[in-house]
Amino acid sequence: VGMIVLNDAYGTGLATNIRSSVESAGGQIIAEEMFNEGDSQFSSQVDAVAATDPDAIVVISFQQATSIVPLLTAKGIDPAQLFFVDGNTSDYSGDLDPGTLEGAQGTIPGPFASDNFKESLLEIDPALKDWSYAGESYDAVTMTALAAEAAGSTEGTAIAAELQGVSADGEKCFDYAGCVTILREGGDID
């Protein structure tokens, strides 16, 4: 596996974890080339990684992917060999030719946003296009509201004191209304 990595805490942190995962699965990182924020030329990194003929290439970047990917494909790298991270899994239809990323894969943090969940969010904000952290944000707001209900207060310290209590060792509930009902009936929720 080859890697082209943004040289900052985000990029190097991901690279360390990817290296660990690849190696623990029996793979090997055969090339790792860094670039700095603000760089606009990536030919040397692409040339160095492509020269090792890796089975896969991980691109740890943000918008720089729009410059890096065409250089990789011009070197004969099949898009199916490309792997992206949350920072560069975006809609590149306005930046790259159709088919440029066909077969490429990427990761996005958090749970998969179901169509029903997306539809619910679009009812609130029809312009929403990015679902990154949507599930976590929804859960955080819901947990905070439930903790406020359990505390009977909107004071930050009171809410904080109840967060663990509304998320462990109680009756399972799966929506806000159901959880609030249990709390208001004197029950304990999880």
What do these predicted ranges mean?
Residues 1-190:
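Extracytosolic ligand-binding ectodomains
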